[in-house]
């Protein structure tokens, strides 16, 4: 079993620009967000968790006010974007860029297409597939 890479904690615009630059041309990128949607008109993005074949990162969306470089990366410069139940994530992306990722693999949708419970939490899908 291969060792997982160390994760990067990204808290500044400079770190974000450097990180996004290092991911350009990646064949795949998986991400998930944490946000607060209670008592607000639009959800407030707090954290973006990112994984590629050889990088892991946590992007502090509270410290970094403009995540446009990340959203532009997934729209223009990576292959497949892997997500789970990404409705809100793609609203963040669309608001920042006016576009969506070209190649999308949504685990929740795929689970539904192959006859699994829909909608289903990520943990539910993993438990059903791995026992």
Where are the regions that the model predicts?
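Conserved DEDDh/DEDDy metal-dependent 3′-5′ exonuclease domain
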Residues: 4-31, 36-131
């Amino acid at each position: 079993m291969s060792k997982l890479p160390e994760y990067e904690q990204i808290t500044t615009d400079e770190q974000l620009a450097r990180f996004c630059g290092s991911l350009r041309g990646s064949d795949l990128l998986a991400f998930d967000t944490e946000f607060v949607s209670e008592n607000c008109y639009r959800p407030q993005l707090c954290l973006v968790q990112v994984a590629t074949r050889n990088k892991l990162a946590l992007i502090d969306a509270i410290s970094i006010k403009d995540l446009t470089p990340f959203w532009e990366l997934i729209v223009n410069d990576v292959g497949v974007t892997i997500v789970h139940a990404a409705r809100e994530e793609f609203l963040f992306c669309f608001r920042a860029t006016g576009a969506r990722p070209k190649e999308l693999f949504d685990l929740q949708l795929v689970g539904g297409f192959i006859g699994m419970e829909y909608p289903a939490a990520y943990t539910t899908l993993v438990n059903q597939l791995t026992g």
